[in-house]
Amino acid sequence: MIINNNISAINAQRTLKFRNVDLSKDMAALSSGMRINRAGDDASGLAVSEKMRTQIRGLRQAERNNSSGISFIQTTEGYLQESQDILQRIRELAVQSANGIYTDADRMLIQVEVSQLVDEVNRIASHAQFNTLNMLTGRFSNPNEGGAPVASMWFHIGANMDERRRVYIGTMTAAALGLQTAEGTGISISSIDKANSAIGIVDEALTKVSKQRSNLPAYQNRLELTAQGLMIAYENTAASESRIRDTDMAETSVKFAKDQILSQANLAMLAQANTMNQGALRLIQ
């Protein structure tokens, strides 16, 4: 009988130590709901999962960016609607003034309203903003169409680099629409001929505004389609990441119960092994 080294106790102690490590992992998985809580749990799985998490967070932010882009376009369209309504009224007054039954004094009264409406077109252009960004002053105009943009309006609508869309918004000031000279003089309807010319000027302005408004739905439709794709990609990527990283609660609960039983058995065997050497005392009594 050997008493200096209790091999049975050492074996039981070793087994108990590793069993407790398994219990600790089981409890971490059950409490967090994740199978991978540290790199040691599954190094390759963690690497893949982190890449997917990066993509998931990027997709969520891209979806928010997309929504902001739609809001920007809708806001711009609202301001252009106001400007177009004003232009329609100016044209109506020009047609009225071009009629020969009115005196010059009558036309001067009509001119007062026209001048006020031209000023309102300028006011809308200068005050149309989204997050303090001027929208209708040519800031985001298309250089290929004669614009001189001072900034670019990019909607980053993807989770990765270069997944973006540029939007152009033309200049909608009274001068850009031909309603006002560089010196600030507005169109005149003080005579029949001037009123007749004003009709053509306003028609050109309406065409320009209508063209810009017709471009906006194309931008918005694309963003709305992109939003659907982003949500589908987010859903599928999140599901894939979940399969890699999340724990199976039922399976882990069964394993936890098994490890608990084995740990308790190890404790009992360790206690039993520690009493085995007590028999040596009887030999020397």
Swiss-Prot record:
UniProt cross-references to InterPro entries, sorted A to Z: Flagellin, Flagellin_C, Flagellin_C_sub2, Flagellin_N
**A Pfam family name for this chain?**
Flagellin_C
Instruction: Indicate the principal place this protein occupies in or around the cell.
Output: periplasm
Task: Offer a single GO CC term for the protein.
Answer: periplasmic flagellum
Domain of life, per the record?
A: Bacteria
Instruction: Extract the GO molecular function terms from the UniProt entry.
Output: structural molecule activity
Keywords annotated in UniProt: Bacterial flagellum, Periplasm
Cellular compartment(s): Periplasmic flagellum; Periplasm
Function per UniProt:
Component of the core of the flagella.
Cite the PANTHER family for this sequence: FLAGELLIN
Q: What is known about its subunit structure?
A: The flagellum consists of an outer layer composed of two sheath proteins, flaA1 (44 kDa) and flaA2 (35 kDa) around a core that contains three proteins flaB1 (37 kDa), flaB2 (34 kDa) and flaB3 (32 kDa).
Q: Which family does it belong to?
A: Belongs to the bacterial flagellin family.
Q: How is this protein named in the record?
A: Flagellar filament core protein flaB2
* Species: Brachyspira hyodysenteriae (Treponema hyodysenteriae)
Q: Which gene encodes it?
A: flaB2
